[in-house]
Amino acid sequence: MKTFVAKPETVKRDWYVVDAEGKTLGRLASEIASRLRGKHKAEYTPHVDTGDYIIVVNAEKVTVTGNKAKNKMYHRHSEFPGGLKSFSFEKLIERKPEMVLELAVKGMLPKGPLGRAMYRKLKVYAGAEHNHAAQQPKVLDI
């Protein structure tokens, strides 16, 4: 008996919509990353992108526990001397609420071309509206 290997052209990808309101950031991000990879499917193959498309709405209402709202820091650097910028979770969720969830999920995906392809299937929106109604996404309870 041979081991089954999924082929990229035969993988069926579904669209799911997730409501992030009141959900904990890390728990939500780990489930989304797992579904983007396709680990919930029987045909999962590590070197093939078998995951589904995930639409996240209400990203501005995601929560963190404890004092992380003030203490959790996000950093970026311009590559120039003295170019380090740091933002707390509170500041970033006010400025760019989608970025918080995107960074959390991106860190949980593989690094390299396959991980970038998986990341492109994630669509995050700050509010309750999204523009993917034509794909008829199913509601996913996490």
UniProtKB/Swiss-Prot annotation:
Q: Where is the signal peptide?
A: none
Q: Which GO terms describe its cellular component?
A: cytosolic large ribosomal subunit; ribosome
Q: Which InterPro entries match?
A: Ribosomal_uL13, Ribosomal_uL13_bac-type, Ribosomal_uL13_CS, Ribosomal_uL13_sf
What Gene3D superfamilies does the annotation carry? Ribosomal protein L13
- Pfam families, alphabetically? Ribosomal_L13
Q: Which molecular function term from Gene Ontology is one that the record holds?
A: structural constituent of ribosome
Which GO BP annotation is one of this protein's?
Answer: negative regulation of translation
Domain of life of the source: Bacteria
- State the PANTHER family in the record: LARGE RIBOSOMAL SUBUNIT PROTEIN UL13M, RIBOSOMAL PROTEIN L13
Q: What does this protein do?
A: This protein is one of the early assembly proteins of the 50S ribosomal subunit, although it is not seen to bind rRNA by itself. It is important during the early stages of 50S assembly.
Which family would the database say this protein is a member of? Answer: Belongs to the universal ribosomal protein uL13 family.
State the name under which the record lists this protein: Large ribosomal subunit protein uL13
Q: Which organism is it from?
A: Vibrio cholerae serotype O1 (strain ATCC 39315 / El Tor Inaba N16961)
